[in-house]
Design a protein with these regions (language model features):
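Alpha-helical solenoid repeat scaffolds of the TPR/TPR-like class and their adjacent stem/linker regions
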Residues: 1-185
């Protein structure tokens, strides 16, 4: 209805794109998203939304470009950084992906999830050679499975790796990563 009242309402097209994406109508979602960015080329959130749609279509390179455009327009858009990290990590660009992933703590959904430990947090600049690293699940089961693909990157560097995850994933992850100590949350 918003678009019928104001055909040049870029935000409405961006929201329509999100709705189509959530309904699994990815072709319609990308059309709406592109309409939004054509109407308002400086709309950072629209480019971030477009990146999400492209990522759902499996078009990771295009998604990365959309997220980078979003970040260029609004360098503090935490969700764009977080989503860029997912695309980069899924492409195997671990260093850049992990750098962007730090932005997740600045997103609304993660502000209260940060856990504080006495041990120092690994900053990826410090060598893990001869050290133990503790990794904990901070998201759902699907994300834990997706992120487990990064364990091989970590285990090649650390002496010992401990993974805390959802109880139902313990048997699967123990079988998949016999060199990782897997514990239930």
């Amino acid at each position: 209805k918003s678009i019928s009242l104001k055909p040049d309402y870029a935000e409405a097209y961006s929201n329509m794109g999100i709705t189509f994406k959530d309904q699994g109508k990815l072709d319609e979602a990308i059309i709406a998203s592109k309409k939004s960015t054509s109407l308002k080329p400086d709309h950072a959130e629209a480019y971030s939304n477009m990146g999400n749609i492209l990522q759902n279509q499996g078009k990771l390179d295009e998604a990365i470009e959309a997220y980078k455009k979003s970040i260029m327009l609004d360098p503090n858009l935490a969700n764009a950084h977080k989503n860029l990290s997912f695309a980069l990590l899924n492409c195997g660009k671990y260093q850049e992906g992990f750098d962007e992933y730090e932005w997740r703590w600045k997103t609304d959904e993660n502000l209260s999830k940060y856990r504080h430990f006495r041990q120092p947090e690994w900053n990826r600049e410090t060598s893990l050679n001869g050290k133990t690293i503790f990794i904990w699940s901070e998201q759902g089961v699907g994300d834990t499975i997706n992120w487990s693909s990064c364990l091989s990157y970590i285990t090649t560097q650390a002496k010992h790796c401990i993974l805390e995850c959802q109880e139902k994933l313990v048997p699967l992850l123990k079988r998949s990563f016999p060199n990782v100590e897997v514990k239930a949350e």
